[in-house]
Amino acid sequence: IMYIITLKISNMAIISETINGKMIDVVINSSNLKTASFNTETEDLTVTFNNGAIYEYNKVPWNKFTKFRLAESQGKYFNENIARSHKYTKKG
């Protein structure tokens, strides 16, 4: 089952979300971040930056991912709460 959710809320940076099984894909309206994909089973968060770089951040808890998705500034939340506190691997 796949769900596509489109959000148009002025204070939120999410453009759309796709929920497909264990993956949640988020398109982000940010000066630095382009997309984020969260694996609900492994808690890995894969982030694509606007410059094309792709990084996978490990063991990001569901509640932290939810706060990231709903943050007024997803880039700021990401930098302060995910990028600096989770192990990561460069994917591309």
Each PLM stretch: what is its role?
Residues I1-N11:
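Short, Lys/Arg-enriched N-terminal segments with co-localized hydrophobic residues
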